[in-house]
Amino acid sequence: MSAVVMGYPMPILLNWNREYNRPAWHFAGSHIAKLESLLGAIETLLESKSDDVGEDDVAVLVDAYDMWFQLPPSVLLERYHRLNSEADARIRKQWKDLGISTDSPISPPRQDIIVTTAKDCFPDSYSGSDPHYEHWPKSPMPKDMYGEDTDKVPWSFDPARKYKKVRPRCVNSGLIMGSMGGLRDALKRSKEKIDTVAMKGRQLWSDQALIGEVIGDQEIWREWMRHLGSSWNGSAAFNDRNSLDRTVRDIADVALLGKRFEFGIGLDYNFTTAPPTCSSEEDGYFVNLSNETNIREESQKAGVPGDIRIHGIPSELRNIKDKLLSSTNWGTIPLYTDFFFGTIPIAIHHNAYINGLKGFRLKNWWHKMWYYPHLRHLITRRLQPTSSPPTLAEIDHNGDKIAYKSPQEDKLHKARVFSPKKPNFTPIDWDAVCQKPGHAVKWHDELFGDDKGPLAV
């Protein structure tokens, strides 16, 4: 419902009332199903040959149970393009610093898919999955962003807070977004890994492990590409295999047989999309962006070294075209903010579990969301019939203007359930989505808290 309030397209639900207990999946049933179902939905949409769906359209996958949106889709799309551009610039600089010629037949990779980041690198090789994190890039964030102890992991019984001062550079699969075509190809690679692992009887831990392995293979492949590119003399590259790590040689051998490893996947190092709150339990809170005193007090409470890192309203929030949000004063409403990164995330990912924080925040923080006092009104307005789906954003990107619109099916203003069997996308009533079976409290009473009864649209 937070996505509906903020004007995102009507959600497509994956694995609704599905069974996850395949023996080959071991403990990772719902996680593996998340990726397989997303692949199935994307393939079904792209194969429909509809003029409404294309390979360049952007899809967003989020965890359904612990993610609250607080900013509109135009901001997410603006940041998506910005993060991709920043990643492309870093890679071009890296190649230039290595002396890789611009006439090399190998071009620097470009980013298309973004995955949220984690401070703790899990699962690791001890779990049976091996993302090869030692081959991943270092974080581009400042080396002193947490002070002199940045990136130090103290000995501790606390499994989460010991990573508090680590700059995130590993994968968290709370949010994955990218072009439909790019996601399809990357998810096919993930499915290949699922099938291979299942045949070998190896433990499958999570979708996070699978995405991590795909990214790990990609980073190793990129290492090999840099090795070849740096020796390019205008007509040939010197493939000195003996100087390569064994892991790189293995990827190179398979790549020479035609296997693809580059999928344009990168990470949200900046914590601007929907970063996890695990290992960042006290790093953020709700503040008014125009209230510097409020920001300073909360930054000091969080332990931010030096001066405050939030300075007013982000530019992408200053010109919201959404009519329902256009009069919102973004500086005077409470927005969840990470004080170390100086960012206002698109959404809050409530996976901070230490001392029962997840359950506590899911129950006690909902009323802190800026739209809570207006929730019923906003949702009622969002669900009104329209003649055509709204424009979500118009992005200026490298001199081109890109317009993003909701799908035609959004005229129904209902969530849809994906099924691999036809009908593939079945509308579902909000009562069925929001009411937990056997739960004594009605969903509308819990969600709105206004004693006005059921939602009337």
Where are these regions (language model features)?
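Intrinsically disordered, low-complexity, Ser/Thr/Glu/Asp/Lys/Arg-enriched terminal regions and linkers
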Residues: 28, 57, 86, 101-159, ...
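Short coil/turn segments at secondary-structure boundaries
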Residues: 1-2, 15-17, 72-75, 127-130, ...
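Extended, compositionally biased interaction tracts of eukaryotic scaffold proteins
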Residues: 23-26, 326, 352-359, 370-377, ...
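N-terminal anchoring/stem segment of glycosyltransferases
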Residues: 1-58, 78-87, 91-94, 181, ...
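Structural alpha-beta junctions
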Residues: 4-13, 82-90, 109, 217-224, ...
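Long, low-complexity, polar/charged, intrinsically disordered or flexibly structured peripheral segments
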Residues: 132-154, 292-322, 401-457
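Catalytic core and acceptor-binding pocket of nucleotide-sugar-dependent glycosyltransferases
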Residues: 142-360
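GT-A fold catalytic core of metal-dependent nucleotide-sugar glycosyltransferases
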Residues: 45-127, 174-177, 181-187
